[in-house]
Amino acid sequence: MRIGTFNILHGRSPDDGRVDVDRLATAVKSLDCDVLGLQEVDRDQPRSLGADLTAVAADAMGAPEHQFVAALSGTPGGTWMAATGDEQPGSASYGIALLSRYPVVSWRVVRLPPLRASVPLWSTYTRRPFLARDEPRVAVAAVLDGPFGQFTV
């Protein structure tokens, strides 16, 4: 069993800064994970070409079970609001995802508050740091039916 985690930087390559969903799919496939946690996942965001990056990754790794969980609805670094509840926003959103080749018995979402202080971020556009208000945080867990019984990730 292979379990992994991957900060996908909303599909952007750290090498050239371009978003390329085919390159993302190739990277995910090369990991050959049975279960994969993704961070910095976009859905329907202009900066990631309007793609559903969870679906791109799930298809690439052959994961029939997957769940995207939005931390926020809107544009990170721009205008947004915290996503709440179990329902997912129908608009552009940003969050995390969990993908599995094994059947999912149950899912659990935990919403966490943002930090109260602003956090320093690096701007690839201005090439200098700036202070930004922290965004909401979220966690997702699943009970999976694996080859040796049920387990939680």
Positions of predicted regions on the chain:
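A substrate-binding/cap region within the structured catalytic cores of diverse enzymes
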Residues: 84, 94-95, 100, 109-113, ...
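Membrane-interface segments of envelope glycosyltransferases acting on lipid-linked substrates or membrane lipids
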Residues: 74-79, 107-108, 115
